[in-house]
């Protein structure tokens, strides 16, 4: 095949694929956009991922998943304001969804909305009081909100549930934050190496 034939074949291929793509509504391309966005995330090309998640979100069938992943990518870029705005409609539509509520709470906390995040983490904990992840998240946010005594008392009550190695590691990290953040006389009765 010579150069002229290759060029003609390329034009024919371009015209042929363009003809079918033009007749295809953009929302039906949502699966491809979603997959492209995911691939861009894997390549750490977050701006492109954001663009394709937004395109995928135009299709109602992909809206929730694309919007959630868009917010996640915003978080990876430390764009917490956009992440909060992306997650808020999802949370408003389904506040009982623990995955969305936890992501929204984390974005709020990272954006500096500590009071709102604390309320959400408290609600998440109250829904599932034996979930060690929820216990540790709530305790960590209490420390972040400078509610140190409340955090110590809460951890003392829940310590018996925190027996897994990872839970103990996170607990020790929270205790270190308490010790670093609070004058010793304020927590002397609450925190000791043996007590927590």
From Swiss-Prot:
Q: Where is the lipid attached (N-palmitoyl cysteine)?
A: 22
Q: Write out the annotated subcellular location.
A: Cell membrane
**Do you know which Gene3D superfamilies this protein is assigned to?**
Tetratricopeptide repeat domain
GO cellular-component terms in the record?
plasma membrane
Does this entry carry the keyword Signal?
yes
Q: Which residues form the signal peptide?
A: 1-21
Kindly provide the name given to this protein in its UniProt entry. Uncharacterized lipoprotein TP_0449
Organism annotation: Treponema pallidum (strain Nichols)
């Amino acid at each position: 095949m010579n150069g002229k034939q290759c060029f003609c074949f390329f034009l024919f291929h371009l015209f042929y694929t363009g003809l079918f793509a033009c007749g295809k509504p953009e929302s039906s391309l949502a699966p491809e956009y979603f997959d492209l966005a995911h691939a861009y995330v894997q390549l750490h090309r977050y701006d492109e991922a954001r663009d394709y998640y937004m395109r995928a979100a135009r299709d109602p069938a992909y809206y929730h998943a694309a919007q959630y992943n868009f917010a996640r990518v915003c978080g990876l870029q430390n764009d917490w304001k956009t992440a909060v705005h992306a997650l808020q409609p999802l949370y408003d539509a389904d506040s009982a969804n623990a995955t969305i509520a936890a992501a929204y709470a984390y974005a709020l906390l990272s954006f500096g909305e500590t009071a709102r995040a604390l309320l959400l983490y408290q609600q998440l904990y109250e829904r599932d009081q034996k979930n060690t992840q929820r216990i540790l998240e709530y305790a960590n946010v209490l420390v972040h909100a400078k509610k140190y005594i409340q955090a110590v008392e809460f951890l003392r009550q829940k310590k018996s549930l925190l027996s897994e190695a990872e839970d103990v590691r996170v607990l020790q990290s929270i205790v270190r934050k308490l010790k670093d953040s609070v004058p010793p006389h304020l927590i002397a009765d609450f925190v000791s190496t043996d007590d927590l």
